[in-house]
């Protein structure tokens, strides 16, 4: 389970002593280990853009496999089942941020790398879902990513609560357990998806995916973000080949989607819902016009700059303003 991202930081960076940074790294290591070693089930609340939803989660680690099931309890039933971070089935329209793309399993947390892009600190203690927690803050060192405040369970290292704020201190996203049981291991029945949970089949063209990573690049990326994977598949509606490139800094992530327009008339767009932004820009290449779309939990100005920086290695590519 990804620790879904900060209440306003109460301590300025110059109050943070190195010992706190070392302690914060230790807690992040525990967090990474807990999600790969600790079974649990519980109920959590997810808040975004002023809207709340409640979810059950079952997370089982067994024989080296991490199996997870999420079920939304409010409104129409929405469900997702994952194995080792890869989505197996979904139902309903999952809230963005809770359901990742089928093949976008997160990389293990690496505090040594993260401290290059975030200031890490233990800033206090709290109590969440009846459990004692340690508060770890990750404050971005630049304007190209958001900050996190993680309330980690003292007993297991699991994230009991996480908050995400923009550079103005506004809450973008909240994840918080209301109950958590780490003693009982979820059963096969607990992890069994309902009949409405439709299997995910990704018709990925591996050869095209490799070519995408070779042909496309960005002239500019936020410091610390690296290409982690690429995919290519045919859109069932437009019948065009959609290529995507995925980047992350070890915590935040975004995707770049590239699709030929084939003469279609489209307009540039920029939208934001909570922490998730989507910026689309038309790009002229020797092979024709393309639509470049950047989607992720990054500031909208950063997403726009990335979209305008995409280049085709086969020849010059220019964005249309």
Regions found by a protein language model. Give the residues of each.
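Short, solvent-exposed recognition patches
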Residues: 199-287, 298-301, 305
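Intrinsically disordered, low-complexity linker/loop segments enriched in Gly/Pro
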Residues: 102-148
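Short, hydrophobic/aromatic-rich segments at coil-to-beta transitions
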Residues: 37-43, 64-69, 130-137, 158-161, ...
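N-terminal leader/targeting segments and the immediate start of mature chains
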Residues: 2-5, 10-66, 113-115, 125-127, ...
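Short, solvent-exposed coil/turn segments at beta-strand boundaries
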Residues: 35-37, 59-67, 81-86, 131, ...
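Gly/Pro-enriched, hydrophobic low-complexity segments
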Residues: 129-197, 271-272
């Amino acid at each position: 389970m990804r620790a879904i991202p900060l209440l306003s930081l109460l301590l300025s960076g110059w109050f943070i002593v190195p010992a706190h940074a070392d302690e914060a790294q230790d807690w992040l290591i525990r967090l990474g280990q807990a999600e790969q070693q600790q079974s649990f089930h519980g109920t959590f609340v997810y808040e975004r853009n002023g809207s709340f939803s409640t979810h059950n989660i079952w997370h089982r680690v067994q024989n080296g496999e991490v199996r997870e099931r999420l079920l939304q309890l409010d409104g129409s039933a929405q469900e997702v089942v994952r194995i080792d971070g890869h989505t197996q089935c979904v139902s309903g329209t999952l809230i963005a941020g809770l359901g990742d793309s089928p093949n976008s399993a997160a990389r293990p947390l690496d505090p040594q790398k993260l401290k290059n892009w975030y200031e890490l600190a233990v800033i206090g203690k709290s109590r969440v879902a009846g459990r004692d927690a340690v508060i770890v803050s990750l404050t971005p060192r630049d304007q190209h990513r958001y900050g996190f405040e993680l309330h980690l369970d003292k007993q297991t290292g699991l994230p009991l609560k996480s908050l995400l704020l923009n550079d103005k201190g506004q809450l973008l996203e909240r994840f918080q357990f209301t109950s958590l049981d780490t003693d009982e291991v979820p059963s096969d029945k607990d992890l069994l998806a309902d009949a409405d949970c439709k299997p995910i089949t990704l018709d990925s063209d591996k050869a095209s995916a490799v070519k995408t990573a070779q042909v496309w690049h960005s002239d500019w990326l936020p410091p610390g973000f690296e290409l982690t994977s690429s995919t290519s598949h045919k859109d069932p509606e437009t019948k065009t080949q959609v290529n995507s490139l995925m980047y992350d800094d070890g915590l935040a992530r975004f995707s770049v989607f590239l699709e030929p327009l084939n003469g279609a008339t489209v307009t540039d767009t920029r939208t934001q819902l909570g922490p998730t932004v989507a910026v689309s820009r038309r790009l002229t290449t020797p092979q024709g016009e393309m639509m470049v779309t950047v989607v992720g939990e990054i500031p909208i100005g950063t997403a726009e700059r990335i979209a305008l920086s995409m280049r085709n290695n086969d020849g010059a590519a220019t964005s249309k303003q």
